[in-house]
Amino acid sequence: MLKIIMPTAMLIPLTWLSSNSTMWVNITMHSFIISLISLSLLNQPLDTGLNFSLLFFSDHLSTPLLILTTWLLPLMLMASQHHLSQESNTRKKSYITMLILLQLFLIMTFAATELILLYIMFEATLIPTMVIITRWGNQPERLNAGLYFLFYTLLGSIPLLITLVSIQNTLGTLNLLIAPYWTQHLPDSWSMNLLWLTCMMAFMVKMPLYGIHLWLPKAHVEAPIAGSMVLAAILLKLGGYGMMRITILLDPLTKSMAYPFLMLSLWGMVMTSSICLRQTDLKSLIAYSSVSHMALVIVAILIQTPWSFMGATALMIAHGLTSSLLFCLANSNYERVHSRTMILARGLQTLLPLMAAWWLLACLTNLALPPTINLIGELFIILASFSWSNYTILFMGFNMLLTASYTLYMLITTQRGKASHHAKTMKPSFTRENALMALHIIPLLLLSINPKIILGLMY
């Protein structure tokens, strides 16, 4: 694991020691090399996972998320270049340092063997994200968004520490490699039910569960492009990863406690998809669609079957790449139109035909068109939930209908129609932007050919 952590940490001195002209090229190329090195983690001959040391390990669940994390840093740097072009060099370097720190914390979160280390790193990701949103966001409302993000996440996750100490006292260990094989189970008392609730709440706020999702649209809309990308692609997946790790430890309790959250997720999935149909703000629409997709993942994790776990892992990776791609496309529109309102960006298909092709591909993956990896994840989850209860097909079917509706609404509003007058002086799409979109789409297409590498622990 150190072969990824050490080079990532060394990107920070590289940032500050690089000359201003070579800074972007240096860091982007080195971070690409790191992401290619991380692909070696896919070679796991044993089912038990690779135990590197007492602190870090990787298995079939954490490996895809680790690779997604390392893959996203060069893409964030490529997307941020125009946004930072007016800033001074010192500020550019501090921005890049924040992104590298965030990647470092995320790698250690996904690779942690001890739950306490996972908790510390889970909390540490809050600091760089908060700085990125409140310092480099576009509008003054970013301070409000940062506060929402901070308080929702902190209040959700502080009780988790107390719960972890309690589990340590009951089971005797918090090691993720040992704890699943421990014979002693947690007692089924009301206090343990409360502990289950505090454990899940920390991760459900991060997912986010419908009802405690209000920080997400604000944070997404106000964050700069790299902030939106990392929030949608990886920080939401922290919640899913934590839930998958902890529900296995709290096994007997999960079966009895999960019902209200399953109901809330199914309801929230339909509600947030309906909200998407009423959005005028492009980034807000993509943020609400993230809430809707993550509700599916919560349902899958709480059902606790091998199929649902496989579906949840596949959908998390697929959604990470798709939502990041949609935010990049929204940002490329924003840089030209200087507004997030969709109707102002209409008719772009005639002006930017190649960008319209990326839009079409992104929208088709978002609405889970066969044979994309998004469909494989959703299909697994729908089958697992249908075997759990037949009535879920009503929610799932309606949600798929709404997802297709709002995705096509987004595509038609931004691409079709008569171009507005101010669009005549618009810049053409840059090679940097086309490369950025291609680097999102190519992994999605490759994963559709070979999905088994991201189906997680149960495959």
Curated annotation (Swiss-Prot):
It catalyses: a ubiquinone + NADH + 5 H(+)(in) = a ubiquinol + NAD(+) + 4 H(+)(out). The lineage of its organism: Eukaryota, Metazoa, Chordata, Craniata, Vertebrata. Signal peptide: none annotated. GO terms for biological process: ATP synthesis coupled electron transport; electron transport coupled proton transport. It is a multi-pass membrane protein. It is found in: Mitochondrion membrane. GO terms for molecular function: NADH dehydrogenase (ubiquinone) activity; ubiquinone binding. The chain crosses the membrane at residues 22-42, 60-80, 98-118, 147-167, 194-214, 224-244, 257-277, 284-303, 308-330, 351-371, 393-415, 435-455. PANTHER family: NADH-UBIQUINONE OXIDOREDUCTASE CHAIN 4. Keywords: Electron transport, Membrane, Mitochondrion, NAD, Respiratory chain, Translocase, Transmembrane, Transmembrane helix, Transport, Ubiquinone. This is NADH-ubiquinone oxidoreductase chain 4. Core subunit of the mitochondrial membrane respiratory chain NADH dehydrogenase (Complex I) that is believed to belong to the minimal assembly required for catalysis. Complex I functions in the transfer of electrons from NADH to the respiratory chain. The immediate electron acceptor for the enzyme is believed to be ubiquinone. Its EC number is 7.1.1.2. One of its GO terms (cellular component) is mitochondrial membrane. Belongs to the complex I subunit 4 family.
